[in-house]
A protein has these predicted regions:
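Long, charge-rich, low-complexity alpha-helical segments
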Residues: 25-186
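Short, amphipathic alpha-helical interface elements at domain boundaries
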Residues: 1-42
Length: 186
């Protein structure tokens, strides 16, 4: 049973007590809850015993983790259940590869919060983050570029991108940006 944590640390925390904010709610996590949340903060982890599974289920009820099955597309499926948000960073593009910079630019400079499926779509189609798609004034143009008659139906984009050739590449990019503290999962 794999999982990944959602939310952001709001106050200085330790490994024993963690202050997390997610969707307008503030949580104080201690003990196994804090440990499990921290272990999934920058990538996927798994519960190793019954106590951790119990803590993981409690975190899921709180909305602080997404649990997925241990299959190839499991990480992608989990990431489709979150929103990708920019983290506060002084020099967000410094030290990143070209592909990471492209993904980060899509995540941080569009006028909307992208889903994982939308990011996979943009990268799969080799659509560059040009000025005409970035910013609040260009949201409609970006939405029209992503959502066509073939992708507008409920969950069709998520399902199509699950079979995309670059799906795993984009999952690795997102996890790399998460580890480098350039994005947060909302």
């Amino acid at each position: 049973m794999k999982y990944i944590s959602m939310g952001a640390v709001t106050k200085p925390s330790t490994e024993h007590i963690v202050y997390v904010s997610h969707c307008g709610f503030d949580y104080t996590l201690t003990g196994d809850l804090a440990s499990m949340w921290l272990n999934g903060r920058f990538g996927f982890d798994s519960a190793r015993n019954q106590f951790q599974k119990k803590a993981l289920n409690q975190l899921e009820r709180m909305g602080l983790v997404v649990i997925t099955e241990d299959v190839l597309e499991g990480e992608y499926r989990a990431l489709t259940k979150v929103r990708l948000g920019p983290a506060k960073s002084r020099n967000p593009y410094m030290g990143l590869s070209r592909n990471e910079k492209t993904a980060l630019k899509w995540i941080t400079e569009t006028g909307l919060v992208l889903s994982m499926a939308e990011l996979v779509y943009l990268i799969e189609r080799d659509i560059e983050p040009e000025v005409k798609y970035l910013g609040q004034d260009n949201v409609q143009r970006l939405v029209e570029r992503i959502y066509t008659k073939d992708t507008i139906f409920d969950n069709i984009l998520e399902n199509q991108m699950e079979r995309a050739e670059k799906r795993d590449h984009v999952v690795r990019l997102v996890l790399s940006l998460l580890k480098k503290k350039r994005i947060v999962l909302l």
